[in-house]
Amino acid sequence: MQKIEYIIITKLWVGDCMEELARDKERAILVAIISSPEDEETLNELKELAVTAGAEVIGILTQKKKGINKAHYIGKGKLEELKMFVENQQADLVIVNDELTGTQIKNLEDALGVKIVDRTNLILDIFAKRARSKEGMLQVELAQLKYRLPRLVGLGGQLSRLGGGIGTRGPGETKLEVDRRHIRNRIKAIEEKLEELEKHRNLQRQRRKKNQIPVVAIVGYTNAGKSTLLNALTGADAYVEDKLFATLDPTARKLVLPSGREVILTDTVGFIRKLPHDLVEAFKSTLEEVKYADLLLHVIDVTSPDMDEKIKVVEKVLSDLGAIETPRINVYNKIDLLEIVPSGNNRDIYISAKNKIGLDRLLEAIERELFKETEVVSFLFPYEKTREYNYLKERGKVIEEDFDEKGISVKAEVTCEIKERLRNFIIS
């Protein structure tokens, strides 16, 4: 991210470049409580998110404190500073770096006289802007409705102008009346539609499993270069833009490996710090494609100054999805911007997806990981060990199975890794 210089005016950060801005962009002031170094990084991301949503960031106000004011998010003195700044700079909205309650939103709007958008609403707004598929649009709407339901009081003013500006994209007035029963009914209807789409996805997954076509899922922090890698490997035309969450709807393409074997390569939505819980829940069926993948390619922006922290964020999301134990190759991207490139190993591959550097080595690593030497092994699973049995069904190639009073007897073709993990269930 390009570093932007700011000047200090009574502890307010204002962009150097203050020429008259085009009025088609909303003028935004960012507000954040800083209690740790990580908060500084999330504030940098908030600026990127605001720009991605279409705002022009004209200033940033921060307050160093441990707790959040229950009424206004920031303290009384800072609120007065912010009010003066909003008036002087003719700001259109204030974007807050945390999730607010309905009461906090209402109190801030009453005090400042401008629209208030919190971090969660901003991310949901970007997702609404990016969604293209039927499923993607339904998932975003579901997340927005669940976010707005407990905030009807605070968002009352915003609901009257839905569809016009940041934080107001998505369901319009006809869909989103200020009526909890109506919203709950809409949530139920969307969830039923998504269940039907999930059944279709499961059928596709079972068909791929039956045809023994491995699935490789590309995961990573947002804007790490996942779609660029998909395009470079498959010749696809997935949407690529240097903005956060440029890809929302998952893309799946056929990939031919050096041996001629074919796999399915999927691109997924990027992860980010403070990813809204409602969004994760709404996109659970899409994100679960990661859980059922045979191999993960974790794309990492090697130029990012907080690379290690972003890796931890991705690993946390993978853990929440139940995919932390899925075989993984770390793909360190953007080496064209480095002066010295590490050599790497079988699990750490250094590439430039943009310049197509290192892709041959990556393809070899994918093939080596997916098609390891296998052997036929017999297992016996007691009926209470369904987790281990399902693991074998997902990861191995079942040749035959039998159910009797002892449990489930399975003969399967497995890798050494699977055999070692299930060694307690092996029978001679």
Swiss-Prot record:
Its main location: cytoplasm. GTP binds at residues 220-227, 245-249, 267-270, 333-336, 352-354. Keywords: Cytoplasm, GTP-binding, Magnesium, Metal-binding, Nucleotide-binding. The keyword Magnesium applies. InterPro entries: G_HFLX_dom, GTP-bd, GTP-bd_M, GTPase_HflX, GTPase_HflX_N, GTPase_HflX_N_sf, P-loop_NTPase. Its cofactor is Mg(2+). One of its GO terms (cellular component) is cytoplasm. It is found in: Cytoplasm. Residues 214-374 form the Hflx-type G domain. PROSITE patterns: G_HFLX. Monomer. Associates with the 50S ribosomal subunit. Belongs to the TRAFAC class OBG-HflX-like GTPase superfamily. HflX GTPase family. GTPase that associates with the 50S ribosomal subunit and may have a role during protein synthesis or ribosome biogenesis. This is GTPase HflX. It comes from Caldanaerobacter subterraneus subsp. tengcongensis (strain DSM 15242 / JCM 11007 / NBRC 100824 / MB4) (Thermoanaerobacter tengcongensis). The gene is hflX.
